[in-house]
Structures are given as structure tokens and as C-alpha cells.
A protein has these predicted regions:
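Active-site loop immediately N-terminal to the catalytic Tyr-X3-Lys motif
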Residues: 15, 64-68
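C-terminal helical subdomain
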Residues: 97, 117-156
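Active-site-adjacent segment of SDR/Rossmann-fold oxidoreductases
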Residues: 62, 83-94
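Substrate-binding pocket helix/loop in short-chain dehydrogenase/reductase
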Residues: 13-14, 18-26
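Active-site helix of classical SDR
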Residues: 37, 73
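Conserved NAD(P)H cofactor-binding loop of Rossmann-fold oxidoreductase domains
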Residues: 5-10
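Residue(s) in the substrate-gating loop at a strand-loop-helix junction
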Residues: 57
Length: 179
């Protein structure tokens, strides 16, 4: 199993982003995960039952204002995960991701996004590690077919609501959370 994790965040309106900050975020969050997956493939392909786990974010459920580029980069990770899970099946490689909400890591230091203020930082690194473990050690056939994995009950509830709701309802809920 390879844990493919790369992420930085910039905050504020896109039009106010410092020169180079968007390029840096995309180089890390998008290119880092993509190139990490590509580099891991030959090793995974030689390992029966291999798995690639990408670290995404609950920000991939609906675009988040004030952290729009970060959110978009995590949408990319979710899409890459889905595509590679299909593409690499022929090589017996399962590809999944984990979507935590705000977790108690250095990534959130100094972040003032409304979604962070409204939801708080309740997820611990240990909870994320447990979600990673559970994602790569599925206990049922249903769980083995699952691609996206939440961490907390709230992550999972938000994902389910987004999956079952029309876009307008999901957008209203995202606005309520993120302002």
C-alpha cells in the first residue's frame, strides 16, 4: 500500500491570491499526487492485491469559498482516484481516497475559513490513520467496492447528503457551512 499524500492550502478570494501561490498549491496538491501515483505504479503492479490511497478532503464534496483553489485541487484528487481505480484494475491495483474534514494538523494553523469556524477542528490524526487503515482493509464486499472514505460521522453524513441531494440543495448546505 502506498499512502499518496500531498497538500498545502491558500486562503482568501482567488483574485487576491499572491503571485505564484496558486501555481505552488497546484504543483503540490495536483502534480504531487499525480506524479506520486505514476512513480508508485510499477511497484504496485508487481505486488498482488496492491493499493494506492490518495489523501483528499471533504472540501471535494462541494466547492469551498475562501479556499477555492485548495477545494478544487481536492476535487482533482477525487477524480484521479476514481479514474485510476478503473484504469489500474487490470494491474490488480485498488485505488481509494480518504476525505477528512478539518483535522488537527499543521495544515489548519492560521486558516480562518468560515467552514473551519463553523465546523471546528474535531478530527485527530489518529482518526485519519484509522480511516486509512479501514479503507485499505475493507471488511465486506460492499466496503471493498467503495472508493471515497470519510473519517468522522459528519464527513460521512455530508458525503451521503451530497450524493443524494440535488445540486441546489447541496449548494445551499455548502453556503450554510462556508458562508
Amino acid at each position: 500500500m502506498v499512502d499518496n499524500n500531498a497538500g498545502v492550502i491558500i486562503e482568501g478570494p482567488l483574485q487576491d491570491a499572491e503571485e505564484g501561490s496558486v501555481d505552488k498549491l497546484l504543483a503540490i496538491n495536483v502534480n504531487g499526487v499525480t506524479l506520486g501515483a505514476r512513480a508508485a505504479h510499477p511497484y504496485l503492479a508487481r505486488t498482488p492485491g496492491a493499493q494506492l490511497l490518495n489523501m483528499s478532503s471533504a472540501s471535494a464534496e462541494y466547492g469551498q469559498p475562501q479556499i477555492a483553489v485548495y477545494s478544487a485541487s481536492k476535487f482533482y484528487v477525487a477524480g484521479l482516484t476514481e479514474a485510476l481505480n478503473l484504469e489500474w484494475r487490470k494491474d490488480d491495483i485498488r485505488v481509494v481516497d480518504v476525505w477528512p474534514l478539518w483535522a488537527k494538523t499543521d495544515l489548519v494553523n492560521g486558516v480562518k475559513a468560515k467552514s473551519l469556524k463553523r465546523l471546528g477542528v474535531r478530527i485527530t490524526p489518529e482518526q485519519v490513520a484509522q480511516a486509512v487503515w479501514d479503507a485499505v482493509h475493507p471488511k465486506s464486499r460492499w466496503a471493498k467496492g467503495k472508493v471515497h472514505h470519510g473519517v468522522s460521522k459528519l464527513d460521512k453524513a455530508l458525503y451521503l447528503m451530497k450524493s443524494l441531494s440535488p445540486d441546489r440543495v447541496a449548494m445551499c448546505f455548502a453556503r450554510l457551512i462556508a458562508g
